[in-house]
Amino acid sequence: SRSRSRNTRSLFDIGVFATTSYHLNQWTLSGGLRFDNRHMHGYEEAGTFAKISRNFGSFSGSVGAVYALTPQMNVRLNVARGFRAPNISELSANGVHEGTQRYMLGNADLKPEHSWQFDLGWDYNSPIIAAQLSLFANRIDNYIFDHKLNGVITSGHETYQYTQGDARLLGGEASVDLHPVERLHFQNAFSYVNSVQLHQPKASKYLPWTPAPHWTSELRYDLIRDGRILNNTFISAALECNLRQNHIYAAGNTETETPSYTLLNLAAGTDFRTNGHRRASLYLTANNIFNRAYQNHLSRLKYLETDPSNPHKGIFNMGRNIGVKFVVYLF
């Protein structure tokens, strides 16, 4: 593929890949191999962009296996080698990002990322319970991220520049969906990731913009499943909990800690049908019922400068909000 940005930079990507899979008794084996090449050329623009010409190319691939322990249970193992070339913005940005009120600087010396990933999974499904556990370990060489600089180029905009370092990411996801009775669902999920920049002092030990540990529980009851006019009618209540995130990239005050918060969300919905065909759907949602003031750790709006009289920096996420959605199916 070829693209051009603002007539100052050009990009050409090309790749080729092959995949295969094989089934043998309880085993399912799969694998893939890919080669990518990216060429970028930046044209000089006086006072803004310097001339740049970079070429990146590398192989990536993966092998995986799934073993069925029983008809309801299986385990999974995958090993992958990854490659990602820096993009145009990471190499040559030089200007204000209006969405985050930041002045972004690229880094023409960035190297491509190379990674190893290992993930192990377990799945179980039965009429009463469905459960899944996934664990992963990533090692990424030359991981690219942006960090805050001390200087200010444009008033009112903090300055960030892309840099890179060697990283290790460990984490996992777990989910349990219980069906104690036919129409009742109790869904639970938890996710966690620990991302560390290797061989760095405490202030820059953790990678920036790492999601906080996240847990959700939803209780859903299907009122009508197969009615003559109403179908898939349900009500639900969900609890969303984001734990405190204190693993931050503190160098240059790039990040700040984010406290924990819990939200309660309610929902209801139904389909309308005639002659056995779905004609329309109606959904009602009420999120953040208790109007909790909170900031998501990944929100870039958390760091915006607001009214000086407000002791809390940044823009908060949405408070209590009620929505109605009506969908008409034409075909």
Predicted regions and their residues:
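Gram-negative outer-membrane beta-barrel transporters
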Residues: F136-R139, H157-Q245
